[in-house]
């Protein structure tokens, strides 16, 4: 074929070396070919610099970074283009779960008929998706690609020019952006080149938004299923299966009983507006489960907004959550909506909720109780409707007892607690997760690596104190350093005494039950009293090993030895007093008073 696909437009558009201009190339075709062929596939070549690229991309970017739903973003993109290009009609078409193009947002055209998935020019759209290359048809009347839709495309306006570009993310074509307009005999090749370049960059920005919203064609439902109707569909109802609520959490991998129990709880909890408190060690996937609750809830069409409370100071946190007025403080050059406003009607995830200061806890409590707030520096009261999900790996009960966390706020956020199991309590899921992470690495790096059964067995025996996050890092590190297409046991750092995490894992080498002694991250402490004084042999790292005892029995033994003083029992077990207190509550052990 004479031309090459315009694959790298998105990358070039945001090149650090050329921030204000995009250099692309177009293979020069003889003039007779341009007019006679009716269809021309374009490839990169140096194009003319024009303000259209800078100002236009800025406007499109502003549309895509809003907190609106994906359908609304795409609709706003297609409706912004007429102010930038001399277009008559246009549409964004995304490849659905079954591989069929589905019109998602339109401008200037009637919605597809009942049961139809596209507006017009299906053959042209199929060509763009299949080849991943732009398509320019100067006169649709002369192209066999448009014969079936010729009447609807021309519709009394005379000759029509068609321009379509692929929507690409990570070298995968996720859909098509196309426009058409009345043919302009004065249009030059340079003008076509500039418009193709600009549309390609817009399409790739839109594709990135599709990818980030989890609507890839290979593992998600069609975009139209996100709402009760398509953007361009007016009051036309979608087929019955589209209106059904999703019931699967496809991105949570695992079949262990501990995980499935949490998943089933998520499905039940998601149908309500109750506050949820996700608890578990770092790396257990609290954000994934929060997203699952949102996607399975009636609020799934509204925004899902998240904020890590531990990363911000109290002053900044207040501004981030509540917003601020112009001039409220130094640097507040404009009014800004807070996360509560952005999440209105949807779901707000507050990660590391246990790290917020007592002073700010009172302000947060008022918002949760009254459903209203004022921006920093403002006096106007704003009403918000937000479903709150909080996450923490902190022992909030001990924090309440010690006065570090308000009891009334604790009761407000702890309506439905969900405890996420650490990876070592579901090690049967490790091979599945490892394969998923390796497949992702292969796609990103164009590799074809695979594990041997022995390698998967090695992974299954690891403790992974960092849980799923650490497992992913382990897989990526091993895959990066692998010297052959097959990963064998000797490729793992832990087999060569080069893995620090394997040393941390030795501190958790005794048997652990569900939500056991380390409900939070296990960490080795220097014991004041010898673990052997409990009557058990010392295990790796100097910690006690009692294979015949359950965690509950081991905890009771330590407490009895310590005279039911939690701090002393913590030193015996190599834990913190907070972890011991957490374990006592999890195992429903009543502390005896001596």
Curated annotation (Swiss-Prot):
Name recorded for this polypeptide: Nif-specific regulatory protein
Keywords attached to this entry: Activator, ATP-binding, DNA-binding, Metal-binding, Nitrogen fixation, Nucleotide-binding, Plasmid, Transcription, Transcription regulation, Two-component regulatory system
Family annotation (Pfam families): GAF, HTH_8, Sigma54_activat
Residues bound to ATP: 280-287, 343-352
Gene3D superfamilies referenced in this protein's UniProt entry, alphabetically: 1.10.8.60, 3.30.450.40, Homeodomain-like (1.10.10.60), P-loop containing nucleotide triphosphate hydrolases (3.40.50.300)
SUPFAM superfamilies reported in the protein's UniProt record: GAF domain-like (SSF55781), P-loop containing nucleoside triphosphate hydrolases (SSF52540)
Ranges of the DNA-binding region feature: 566-585
Subunit structure as annotated in this protein's UniProt entry: Interacts with sigma-54.
Residues reported in the UniProt entry to bind a divalent metal cation: 494, 499
Region (Disordered): 213-243
Chain residue ranges for the region called C-terminal DNA-binding domain: 552-594
Record region (Inter-domain linker): 481-551
Gene source species: Sinorhizobium fredii (strain NBRC 101917 / NGR234)
Domain Sigma-54 factor interaction, chain residue ranges per copy: 252-480
One GO term of the biological process aspect: nitrogen fixation
Stored PANTHER family: PTS-DEPENDENT DIHYDROXYACETONE KINASE OPERON REGULATORY PROTEIN-RELATED, TRANSCRIPTIONAL REGULATORY PROTEIN
Domain GAF, residue spans: 69-210
Annotated GO MF terms: ATP binding; ATP hydrolysis activity; DNA-binding transcription factor activity; metal ion binding; sequence-specific DNA binding
DNA-binding is among the record's keywords: yes
Its biological purpose: Required for activation of most nif operons, which are directly involved in nitrogen fixation.
Top-rank taxon: Bacteria
